[in-house]
UniProtKB/Swiss-Prot annotation:
Endonuclease that specifically degrades the RNA of RNA-DNA hybrids. It is an enzyme of class 3 (hydrolase). Its EC number is 3.1.26.4. It catalyses: Endonucleolytic cleavage to 5'-phosphomonoester. Its main location: cytoplasm. This is Ribonuclease HII. The lineage of its organism: Bacteria, Pseudomonadati, Pseudomonadota, Gammaproteobacteria, Pasteurellales.
Length: 197
């Protein structure tokens, strides 16, 4: 972790991050993590910079060593109703509310923070600067990838395990060929177009 981030003066700090704002399908998944300072975890980094194997190993270690962790999500219908930004904020609120220890302070990756009952701060590139946010990004990514693998079993023709629901050339081709699944985000332009909305 970089040392140029100054931590707030707080005892129990939760890190929060999201995965899945860009995909055309599935939930946006968030995680909140309070790490144990007496039980450090080596190798925490932004989940996008880690191999899948390393992410899976770290996710297990985070779950075992963290003081507490929680996942929060917003479903495709909530994304369609609220818009992706508001749905992401809602999913973050759910992740923090799901912690079985209430944090004194919350650090959120990015430039926006949800409304929370405790002080919070947004940290640009937080997934590379703050261990708690890195841990949250890993848990959220592993959880969402798992959901895409399960969706791939249900709808093998779409290639969800490959593109994870992101708007790739392959995904567009499959959408054109097979139409949208019930899990596609109807408010996202490419899906809207396919559905003729």
């Amino acid at each position: 972790m970089s040392t140029n981030f100054i931590y707030p003066n707080a005892h129990l700090i939760a890190g929060v991050d999201e995965v899945g704002r860009g995909p055309l399908v599935g939930a946006v998944v968030t995680a909140a993590v309070i790490l144990d300072p007496n039980n450090p975890i080596e190798g925490l980094a932004d989940s996008k910079k880690l191999s899948e194997k390393k992410r899976l190993l770290l996710a297990e270690e985070i779950k075992a060593k963290a003081l507490c962790w929680s996942l929060g999500r917003a479903e495709p219908e909530e994304i369609d109703r609220l818009n992706i930004l508001h749905a992401t904020m809602l999913a973050m609120q759910r992740a923090v509310a799901g912690l079985n220890i209430q944090p004194d302070f919350v650090l959120v990756d990015g430039n926006r923070i949800p409304t929370l009952p405790m002080p919070a701060q947004a940290v640009i590139k937080g997934d590379s600067l703050v261990a708690e946010i890195s841990a949250a990004s890993i848990l959220a990514k592993v959880a969402r990838d798992q959901e895409m693998a399960e969706l791939d079993v249900q709808y093998p023709e779409y290639g969800f395990a490959k593109h994870k629901g992101y708007p790739t050339k392959l995904h567009f081709e499959k959408l054109e060929q097979f139409g949208a699944t019930p899990f596609h985000r109807k408010s996202f332009a490419p899906v809207k177009k396919i559905l003729g909305l």
